[in-house]
Structure formats: C-alpha cells, structure tokens
Regions:
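Histidine-acidic metal/acid-base catalytic patches
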Residues: 1-28, 38, 50-53, 101, ...
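Short glycine-enriched loops at secondary-structure junctions
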Residues: 10-12, 61-65
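Soluble or luminal CAZymes and related metallo-dependent hydrolases
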Residues: 16, 37, 41, 91-95, ...
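Conserved beta-strand positions in the central sheet of alpha/beta enzyme cores
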Residues: 33, 57-60, 112, 154, ...
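Active-site gating loops and adjacent loop-to-helix segments of metal-dependent hydrolytic enzymes
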Residues: 65-84
Length: 282
C-alpha cells in the first residue's frame, strides 16, 4: 500500500489547525502536508510533529507576499504563486528563502512552488513565452538555493476548471520544464485529481512518469467533487495497486498526499469516518 500523508489544510477542518496533527496521528497517519506554515510559530509546529510522531513531507512556498500577514492576504485575494509572473522575481525569491527557513526547521524535504496565474489583460503566445522564461529562471534559482540544504522544489500542474489561468496544467508540460531546468532536486508534484480532469488516462500516466525519477510527490482526491478518493469516477483501489507495482519496479519511495475535502469534514469526526477507503486499499 502507498504511504499516505494527511493534508491538514483540508482534513480535520472541524478542529483548530494545530489540533489536526494529533487527529491525523490518531487515525494512523505517519506524515502530514498542508498549504502554508507561515502563520504559526515554528517551535509550536515542530512540537506538534514530535509529540505525534509525524513527518512533515510537504508545504507550499508563499503564493505572494513576504511575511505572514502579506501571505494570508495574498492567498485570500486570489494569488496562486509568483514563479511565472514577470516583474515579481524579487518577491518569489524572498518567498522561497522564507520557505527554506521553515523547511530547515521542520526538516521538510519538499517545497511546492505554485506557478502563478497568467494575466487577464494580456493573452496569447507572447505572454506564455514570457511567463515560461521567468518560470524556468526562477525555478533554476530556487533549485540551486534548495540544494544547499538538501531540499527539493516541486511544481504541480493544476486543472484550469478549479484554477482558471493557472500557468501549468499538464503533466508533459511540467516534465518538460523539469528537463529544461536540469536540476536533480526539481521534481513534479503529480496530483491525480488534476491529472484526471485535464488529461485522464491516469494509470498510464503513472506508469509513464514514476519511472523517470522526476515525480517527487503524489496527491489524490475523488473526481469531480474532490471528496474521498473512492467517491467519483476514479478507481482508487486500482490506482493504488498501480502505484505499488510501478514503485516496486522502479524504486519510487514518495508519499501520497490526501488533499481532498471530506464529505463530512465539517462534522465532528467527519474526516475519520471517511477513511474507510484507506483500510480497503490495504
């Protein structure tokens, strides 16, 4: 069975954020991921991890802004990354530097740098070309900085239905960027939810990309409602078998992040009651 990490931004939302660590451990998770750590004291986050025997395996670099209030405000205003946005290179670098400080303190091996949104006012090939040039340059710099402390930078294709104008949508696009940058610590965060919506053929995509060594992290959710992975059109039990099979063949050892919205998530114990899919997968 794959190794599952609880996404604390979406799971256990009936609880205050810091209490979600204990809830995840109680349900048998050994690792966690979430969007952003910046609004919380580092010592408190580390204490929650240690007290509950959890590994921090992923979080995001800031979507915009350079301090906790600015980051929260940027996310609330719809910012979804600065990596591909011309003119915001200094903001991107400051955000990555902040993320690396948190990653070092939390011993987190992976940081997801969201690509950002294409402008509404400028469309077409010229804008995409400029965005890609900035994206590659920023990621090359970020990978170099992250390598100094043994961290990996991740990029994630996200479907345009949930996130219109997001710069990166397809797996092949992400892998092309990773190959162009050429840094061994730049990898793809492959979310099977987004992959199914944009491309489908998820099992074959897993067979194609996991053996490349360019996939650093997987995420799952049911399609189309983004509930538990066994709700909707994806056959999650089969996909878990594919992951196990391919991982055994190629040595892939990554985590599978549970980035979904539980159907009963707002109810006390709702996340826990929805975890039957995990037991069936084992």
């Amino acid at each position: 069975m794959p190794r599952f990490a609880a996404n604390l931004s979406l799971l256990y939302t009936e609880l205050p954020f810091l209490d979600r660590f204990e809830a995840a451990a109680r349900d048998g998770f050994e690792a966690v991921e979430y969007l952003f750590p910046y609004a919380f004291d580092l010592a408190e986050l580390l204490a929650r991890l240690k007290a509950n025997g959890l590994q921090q395996v992923l979080f995001n670099a800031p979507p915009g802004g350079t301090d906790a209030p600015g980051i929260d405000a940027a996310w609330a205003a719809g910012a979804r990354g600065t990596a591909s946005v011309p003119g915001r290179e200094a903001e991107f670098r400051a955000g990555v530097e902040l993320a690396l400080r948190y990653a070092d303190a939390l011993d987190c091996p992976r940081i997801h740098c969201m690509a950002g949104l294409l402008s509404e006012s400028a469309a077409g090939a010229d804008q995409e070309s400029a965005a890609r040039s900035v994206y590659v340059s920023n990621l090359r710099w970020a990978a170099t900085e992250a390598a100094k402390s043994g961290r990996t930078i991740l990029i994630e294709p996200i479907n345009p239905r949930d996130m219109p104008r997001f710069f990166l949508n397809r797996q092949d696009e992400a892998h092309a960027v990773v190959q162009e940058v050429g840094a061994p610590n730049l990898q793809v965060q492959m979310d099977l939810y987004h992959c199914q919506i944009v491309e489908g053929d998820v099992a074959m995509k897993l067979r194609q990309y996991l053996p490349t060594g360019r996939v650093g992290h997987l995420q799952i959710a049911g399609v189309p409602e983004r509930h538990e992975p066994d709700v909707g059109e994806l056959n999650c039990a089969y996909l878990f078998e594919v992951i196990d099979e391919v991982a055994a063949q190629c040595g892939w050892q990554g985590w599978v992040g549970c980035e979904y919205r539980p159907r009963m998530g707002a109810e006390p114990g709702g996340t826990s009651r929805g975890l039957g899919w995990r037991a069936r997968a084992g």
